[in-house]
Amino acid sequence: MTKLITTVKEMQHIVKAAKRSGTTIGFIPTMGALHDGHLTMVRESVSTNDITVVSVFVNPLQFGPNEDFDAYPRQIDKDLELVSEVGADIVFHPAVEDMYPGELGIDVKVGPLADVLEGAKRPGHFDGVVTVVNKLFNIVMPDYAYFGKKDAQQLAIVEQMVKDFNHAVEIIGIDIVREADGLAKSSRNVYLTEQERQEAVHLSKSLLLAQALYQDGERQSKVIIDRVTEYLESHISGRIEEVAVYSYPQLVEQHEITGRIFISLAVKFSKARLIDNIIIGAE
């Protein structure tokens, strides 16, 4: 049975005991509203580690002034049931006041990796992500931490944070989990209308078009971006916010493609903003 831990102090006590006995800890940080994408990471951790910890914490620091922190879906009872079914040992669900008992005296600034793509549209977002992940790593002290490749920019930033701050954790990137028709699983999909849900499948189809162009030898980013944009414009009613080609994990905008690349999409429907990506090319 999955145990619910609600305080930092109790979580640290459990972790210290586990470390003394040589127990390996796998960790999946989440903001809740869990779906199959999260559960895939939990299953991976359960198959590899002695203890699997899932955090459910809606982090206020990664919400901007025009983003509604209070409206973010919270369903801790359902989340607890879901992770129990796939074998998680602990759900860590602290209060905001416990994670941030006072005003932070040190601001974390991510730098260039956060100045592009999602970071450019949501200033301060990745500073908040890195702050909370840093704190969670210090509390849970995992041997392995699991992040989805759907948030590929976040994954690149967390990997850089681990390197820069010498965290003794290995980051495991988990492939995007998709619906049968190709739509990337996301907590935001529930906000799509029936028509938008039918259209949303074309995000992944446009990425497959980009991949096909690349495999056919196309190396001009503008050509790929234009073709993907044209495809989306003819298949969806949502507003196309971004179609971009960047190196990965360096996140440098590419004009003439060389090496490994990251093709990123962002589309705003009436009540849901969806992102998707594909990583292709040699390392």
UniProtKB/Swiss-Prot annotation:
(R)-pantoate binds at Q62, Q154. Beta-alanine binds at Q62. Its EC number is 6.3.2.1. The active site is at H38 (proton donor). It catalyses: (R)-pantoate + beta-alanine + ATP = (R)-pantothenate + AMP + diphosphate + H(+). InterPro entries: Pantoate_ligase, Pantoate_ligase_C, Rossmann-like_a/b/a_fold. It comes from the Bacteria. It is found in: Cytoplasm. GO terms for molecular function: ATP binding; pantoate-beta-alanine ligase activity. Its main location: cytoplasm. Pathway: Cofactor biosynthesis; (R)-pantothenate biosynthesis; (R)-pantothenate from (R)-pantoate and beta-alanine: step 1/1. GO terms for cellular component: cytosol. Keywords: ATP-binding, Cytoplasm, Ligase, Nucleotide-binding, Pantothenate biosynthesis. ATP binds at residues 31-38, 148-151, 177, 185-188. GO terms for biological process: pantothenate biosynthetic process. Catalyzes the condensation of pantoate with beta-alanine in an ATP-dependent reaction via a pantoyl-adenylate intermediate. NCBIfam families: panC. Homodimer. Belongs to the pantothenate synthetase family. The reaction proceeds by a bi uni uni bi ping pong mechanism. This is Pantothenate synthetase.
